[in-house]
């Protein structure tokens, strides 16, 4: 049995004291079977988003909050969009999102339903000590498997496993080797809330996530938490 630890650095909360990150850990999943019901739920979330965002998505409060957060650590939000802004703009074209696999589709569905970033990462031997923090000099990011290391700006918010960067610019882009595949069986999800997204919104998204993964991927939820400035760490035992 191994231990999975997830921490949000105090430096993140210093800049964003009301930030919350929902974290949910699953094991023994079956991510191999596409499901028409899940696809229909995704289409419903896309349609609902189009009725909620009828003007410039950059000005929608839940998206504007991320643009402000990106500016704070030196990113240009018009060049490097948060995952929820990029996803929303794609849906508003209007395009339907592709069916990738159930876990990825569930993350996209929740992002659109709550208008917040939600992502999934596989858990492996080298990814059991996770931290959301600001960059360190030794950090390395590989955007593509087998590719070259990409330089990272100082002060950028990144998701890490040791010096390995799993996601750049908070919610912008995952490393090439962190993709969730059809054979993936153990994962963690991130669900992000910056005001005006509330504690209740993040908790509701976490509850939806647990229900959807149980319905469409089976497996077990090993633990879940909403991390905040008072409770920045989560520990789960993996079997």
Language-model features: locations:
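Charge-biased, low-complexity intrinsically disordered regions
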Residues: 1-239
């Amino acid at each position: 049995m191994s231990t999975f630890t997830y921490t949000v650095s105090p430096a993140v909360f210093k800049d964003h004291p009301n930030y919350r990150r929902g974290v949910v850990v699953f094991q023994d999943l079956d991510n191999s079977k596409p499901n028409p019901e899940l696809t229909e739920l995704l289409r419903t979330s896309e349609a609902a988003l189009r009725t909620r965002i009828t003007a410039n998505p950059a000005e929608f409060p839940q998206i504007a909050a991320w643009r402000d957060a990106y500016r704070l650590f030196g990113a240009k939000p018009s060049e490097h969009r948060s995952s929820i802004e990029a996803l929303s703009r794609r849906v508003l074209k209007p395009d339907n999102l592709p069916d990738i696999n159930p876990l990825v589709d569930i993350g996209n569905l929740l992002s659109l339903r709550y208008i917040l970033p939600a992502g999934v990462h596989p858990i492996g031997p080298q990814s059991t000590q996770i931290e959301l923090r600001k960059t360190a000099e030794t950090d390395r990011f590989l955007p593509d498997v087998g590719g070259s290391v990409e330089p990272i700006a100082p002060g950028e918010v990144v998701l890490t496993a040791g010096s390995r960067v799993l996601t750049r610019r908070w919610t912008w882009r995952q490393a090439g080797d962190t993709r969730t595949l059809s054979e993936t069986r153990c994962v963690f999800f991130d669900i992000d809330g910056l005001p005006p997204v509330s504690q209740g919104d993040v908790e509701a998204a976490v509850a939806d996530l647990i229900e959807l993964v149980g319905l469409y991927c089976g497996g077990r939820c090993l633990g879940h938490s909403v991390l905040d400035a008072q409770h920045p760490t989560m520990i789960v035992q993996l079997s």
